[in-house]
Amino acid sequence: MLGIDIGSNTLRAVFMDEYFNKLKSEEFIIATAKNMQNGLISNEAIQRLFNALKILSEKYNLSQAKAVATAAFRNAKNTEDIFIKIEKEFQLKIQVIDAKTEAKLSILGMQERLKTLKLFRKNLSYCDLGGASCEISNDYFSKSYDFGIISFYERMNFKAIKPNAYVNFFKKHPKNLAYIKDKKLKIHFSSYPVHFKQIFFEAFNVIKEAKKNLKGKFFVLNSGVPTTLCAYKQNIKYKDYLEESVNGKILKRKDFFNFALKIWNLEQEKAKIYLGENRKKYLIAGSMILFALFDKQKLIVIDDGVREGVCIAHFKNIKF
């Protein structure tokens, strides 16, 4: 069976058998949440979506697939018109799912992979940071927050701020930064690029409510930010990405800050090779969000998510 997750940043598809073996997987960057200030999915994003579906239609019978769409399509005014055209051209029916169902399917996919890796345990918490929303869940709690890697970055109001006397002082005497214990203040006085620091501080603002509800020592992360980070640490190029290379990897909070800083300084051509086309700024934004969100939790990376959950729900006869 082919399960399709049409997200706010990527379209992900998986061909799975009834034993939950993944026979083939596909991923396309469609960035549907990009330039949605007027409440409409842009013509450029629609074209990227249709291009992705055309490629899939040449490999699979889309009339037999199960497809779901998430946050950007929940919010867009032109979702119905887009889906009518898709059904007419590809015979594919798409179901817009609510945040609770999205979290349920994402967890279903993650848990099955954790069981395969013998990493599943009780009292795990889950975080799925998408393009336009972030779902945080555990056995007793599930909530969707109105920030994602694209929507967060698109809302940034970058300002041209000149370094003040303190920044100039610490730039000349960087060792003195060690005496500042407050981490945010240390960043404020650092010589990091101005826009980098603005993303850093805004990330702490947007996650305030989510952080209050954050419970648990072990979190499973399954979105493109942690998976790309893990691949990048292993020097794996975007085109050579393999799910097996990231599944079960453990990350620490500081990994996200370090990743954001490294790719900030990565030239565009290399960024395209290692991160994928036009993903650099959104990965920086997402890394800052996850750095701000977590503290000392153990973070487990799993590639599986909604697309796998769609297939597993079908085979287990779970209604959604």
Go through each PLM region and give its residues.
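Short glycine-aspartate micro-motif
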Residues: M1-D5, L124-D128
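Ser/Thr-glycine-rich phosphate-binding loops at phosphate-binding pockets of nucleotides
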Residues: S8-T10, M110, G130-I136, G224
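Conserved hydrophobic/aromatic positions in well-ordered beta-strands
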Residues: V14-M16, S137
